[in-house]
């Protein structure tokens, strides 16, 4: 093994607000002691309180997302509940693609599966 995943990093215009949103979706909590000042911006992470999921970092960037993500997060969850929290529906589930594509409040796409892992 040459390496392992240490965490996931998301670019964000409002990194604290986006971190709080993802906490509400995933049941994560803000990681205390990880906030840093970086040119006046908050740089921090969120973590799974059960220590089962990866830590997610939020990196301040000056520009909005303009193209489709080259990489995305897949989660198991309740699509309606995530939409009610402020996600946007990008693509419906179909028999060929049994997951939904949603976007977070800053437009970052992610997939939601509602049942068993569809990729195994």
Language-model regions: role of each:
Residues 1-34, 45-93, 103-120:
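Glyoxalase I/VOC metalloenzyme domain signal
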Residues 42:
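Active-site segment of metal-dependent pyrophosphate-handling enzymes
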Residues 95-97:
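Short, small/polar residue-rich loop motifs at catalytic or cofactor-binding pockets
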């Amino acid at each position: 093994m040459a390496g392992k995943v240490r965490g996931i990093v998301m670019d964000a215009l409002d990194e604290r607000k986006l971190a709080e949103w993802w906490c509400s979706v995933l049941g994560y909590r803000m990681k205390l002691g990880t906030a840093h000042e970086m040119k006046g911006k908050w740089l921090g992470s969120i973590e799974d309180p059960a220590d089962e999921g990866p830590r997610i970092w939020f990196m301040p960037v000056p520009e909005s997302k303009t193209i489709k993500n080259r990489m995305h997060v897949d989660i198991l969850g309740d699509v309606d509940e995530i939409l009610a929290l402020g996600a946007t529906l990008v693509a419906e589930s179909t028999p060929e693609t049994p997951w939904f594509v949603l976007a977070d409040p800053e437009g970052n796409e992610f997939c939601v599966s509602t049942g068993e892992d569809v990729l195994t």
